[in-house]
Amino acid sequence: MFWTKKNFDVYGEQGGISTAITLPEGFNTASDRCPMVILMHGFMANKKFHPIPTLAKALAKAGIASISFDFNAHGKSEGKFIDMTIANEISDAKAVFEYVKTLPYVTEIGFAGHSQGGVIAGMLAGELEDDPRKPACMVLLAPAAVLK
């Protein structure tokens, strides 16, 4: 198996955020270093919904770690769907980003988002323009809309 997952919770405004880290085969978090991509799913989906697992596996094969997560009120994350907004999804993604910045084995951070996750990735990247660890790259897969 070329990838492994480690589950844990990051906390956002709406509660616990269910996450999974996918690492390249044989990767040692104590001694190895690599970039990490934050994978963001679309509306009404979750971290197990296509294309997120496919992307995580492909990145791991290429020697790149990834972290996928369920936005609030999706999958195994806390929160009520009626309370989910673009603003608190951006907050969820930022909480994951802040967590990734603390991982000593991560050299660079990238974003990849599908559908509404693409919108969130783009909007968060704009907010992080002055952050020294801002995303080194970003891929938007069928972003849902343009929001101002």
Describe each PLM feature range.
Residues 96-148:
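Primarily recognizes the serine-hydrolase "nucleophile elbow" in alpha/beta-hydrolase
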Residues 32-42:
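Short beta-strand element of the alpha/beta-hydrolase
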Residues 1-31:
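N-terminal cap/lid segment of alpha/beta-hydrolase-fold proteins
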Residues 48, 74-106:
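Catalytic nucleophile-loop/oxyanion-hole region of alpha/beta-hydrolase
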Residues 44-56:
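The serine-hydrolase catalytic nucleophile loop
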Residues 44, 71-75, 145:
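Alpha/beta-hydrolase active-site loop signature
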Residues 56-78:
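Conserved alpha/beta-hydrolase
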